[in-house]
Amino acid sequence: HGVDPEDKDGFYRMLKVYAENMAEHRQNVFRVSLELIRSSRAADGSLHLDFSEFDRWADVFWDTGRMDLLETGFVARFGEGGWSSREVLLRDFSVKDEPSGKTVRLDGKEFLPKFLPALVEHLREKKWLDKTVFHICDEPSNHNVMPWREASDFVHQCAPELRRIDAIETTHCLDRLEVWVPKLNHLSTWQNAYEEAQRRGNEMWLYTVGIFQGGSLPNKTVDVPLIDS
């Protein structure tokens, strides 16, 4: 876009263009990365958090007047092999060590119990808590749903106020997820199980895949080759 990487104001002006374009196309949910929250650790081990960039990004979208939800999170990752892995692991987080001035990586089990309650309090102060949904790990499936459940439970223990959301390829999410987001083909295959989850009070979305995948459901993917349509 011709924006100088050092021109932060220019970047946010361009982000506003994107936000307005999303709103014009009836997109009412936006995402803010947790990486925008700057973390530092004092000599006594206490964690200090700077939410200024997180807030500035979010305000660009709220200021459209047409956004309903803020998405953030993604605090876990798949093990070796990516999506096919049977492991779901809490990820590491970058933290500036104040005494040394160096950036260190903290394990999620050490970082999240301090970070998540502070995030909840900040969201509450901004009056955003009820408008926030929080990701654990993208697309857990039957072959790795058990470690995903453990990661989701860990987040819930640290911050029970956060409403959890994930794209899922499984039905085994009861008591570990508030907003379920299956693909259209999984919704079709396991419709009874998903309807039961709704009866138990879970919110149900569905999502459209960004890469072409074949199948009998025409609305499964964003783009479908004409020959297949």
Feature map (PLM): residue ranges:
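Aromatic-lined carbohydrate-binding surfaces of glycoside hydrolases
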Residues: 1-163, 167-178, 211-213
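Catalytic-core region of carbohydrate-active enzymes that cleave or remodel glycosidic bonds
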Residues: 179-229
